[in-house]
A protein has these predicted regions:
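Glycan-processing catalytic domains of CAZymes
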Residues: 2-247
Length: 247
């Protein structure tokens, strides 16, 4: 099952998380009523549904603070009980919430967490903390909702670390240069690419494998990966060039 991504409306995009398919702004008037919109979760099983829209914006506060209830059941949209950010149907783990994910907080690389680079991480320590983080955030061993790993610091494919993520390429080059100062720049860059992609792949594969072992009924996946980067395509298919990058 793929994760559905969308926006409720452009002007609300900073308030609502872009992981989920949300109803268009034209439906807003119908969605707001005085009825209690909290789902009866047993009415909406996830299994055996080819397409599912799930809401994980923490809009339960709208009812508590403003007496505005957002009714989503009319549109067959699943929501966590009391419309919480994490719950029965969807749980999201961000950079600092799952294990020891390494990343930089700025494109200059002046501030890093857990070494900043997948090449520098202690994988055993990461997996140990990750196990504890999952058990704490998803205490139910039979959890069968979406479990989204939202790691957005870097992308595991070298070519996709462009713009503000270029720091992961440049730091990878520096790591190889420190070990092999006599190498040509061409050889350094090629080795940097190999080392980065190898360690990034091991990091991500080991992480999701462990997650599936701990909560095997959960629908685990990464936010934003793989990505077709095909916003200009009209046939809803990944181009051959993009497909090759992810193989």
């Amino acid at each position: 099952m793929s994760f559905v991504q969308g926006l409720f409306a452009a002007r609300l995009s900073r308030l609502l998380h872009p992981l989920l398919l949300l109803v268009g702004i034209s439906l807003l008037g119908d969605a707001l009523d005085i009825k209690n919109s909290y789902c009866k979760c047993e009415e909406f099983p996830i299994e055996d549904r080819p397409f599912v829209a799930i809401w994980n914006a923490p809009t339960g506060g709208c009812s508590v603070n403003f007496s505005i209830n957002i009714n989503l059941r009319d549109f067959d949209i699943l929501e966590n009980p009391k419309q919480t950010w994490n719950g029965k149907y969807v749980t999201v783990f961000y950079n600092a919430q799952l294990g020891l994910y390494p990343y930089f907080t700025n494109e200059q690389g002046t501030n890093s967490y857990n070494g900043g680079m997948p090449q520098l991480i202690n994988l055993a320590a990461h997996l140990d903390k990750m196990k504890r983080d999952i058990i704490k955030k998803i205490p139910d061993p039979d959890y069968n909702g979406l479990a989204i790993i939202d790691w957005e610091g870097w992308r595991p494919t070298w070519e996709r670390n462009f713009d503000s993520k270029r720091i992961y390429q440049s730091r990878s080059v520096e790591l190889v240069q420190d070990k092999h100062p006599e190498w040509s720049m061409e050889n350094v860059i090629e080795e940097a690419r190999k080392e980065f992609e190898r360690t990034a792949r091991v990091f991500m594969e080991s992480s999701i494998k462990l997650a599936r072992q701990i909560r095997p009924k959960g629908l685990w996946g990464f936010y934003g990966f793989p990505d077709c980067f095909g916003s200009n395509e009209t046939n809803y298919r990944c181009s051959d060039d993009v497909s090759k990058v992810h193989h």
